[in-house]
Amino acid sequence: MTTDFLFPKIADCSYVSCYCEENVWKLCEQVKRTRPEELAKCYAVFVSNEGRTVPLWRQKAGRGDDQVVIWDYHVFFMHNPLPNRCLVFDLDTTLPFPTYFHKYVTETFRSDLALRPEHHRFFRVIPADTYLIEFSSDRRHMRRPDGSWIKPPPSYPPILSNTNTHCLGDFICMSAGKGPGAVYSLSEFVHNFYKQPNMVAQNNK
């Protein structure tokens, strides 16, 4: 891999455990500040399904040799600078940071064929500039009924948009036509973002 990455070191990225949606928002913000010409090629990607039970492998919070965990949702960052070059920046993976799209998808999501339908993964892909404007969370989903925190929140103030105080559910929702961005099945997601070099060459003829 070349070392010309948007985020050379994972240690330089803002990270708070269990706040992946905010971690990715901060990555988008960093690109806008330091590499604005690349922002249009970047995406925030939410992974979930109707039952909010999505298995992911190679996760730091995972168990066993395969490091598998079942999340209600997960969020990662993608940079797609060229038709045949897409990089995934996941602050919670045990894979390299970043990882090429095909390797990340293959090892993190594997296949839906061996899973029950209720565990199939869907992906909401949101352009980074849209995510920066529309995402808003007052962190209510991380509070217990008594008001205490399930996990300690980030030290910075909540990320709030000008029009909404909490719209996280709109991003986690995987209903097509509702919420920002586009929703894909696993196979559709791969089809849209994984292009082999020879396929790109043929399409350009």
Curated annotation (Swiss-Prot):
The active site is at residues 20, 74, 90. Its EC number is 3.5.1.122. One of its GO terms (cellular component) is nucleus. The keyword Hydrolase applies. Disulfide bonds: none annotated. The keyword Hydrolase applies. Keywords: Hydrolase. Transmembrane segments: none annotated. It catalyses: N-terminal L-glutaminyl-[protein] + H2O = N-terminal L-glutamyl-[protein] + NH4(+). One of its GO terms (molecular function) is protein-N-terminal asparagine amidohydrolase activity. Monomer. PANTHER family: PROTEIN N-TERMINAL GLUTAMINE AMIDOHYDROLASE (PTHR13035:SF0). Belongs to the NTAQ1 family. Mediates the side-chain deamidation of N-terminal glutamine residues to glutamate, an important step in N-end rule pathway of protein degradation. Conversion of the resulting N-terminal glutamine to glutamate renders the protein susceptible to arginylation, polyubiquitination and degradation as specified by the N-end rule. Does not act on substrates with internal or C-terminal glutamine and does not act on non-glutamine residues in any position. This is Protein N-terminal glutamine amidohydrolase. The gene is tun.
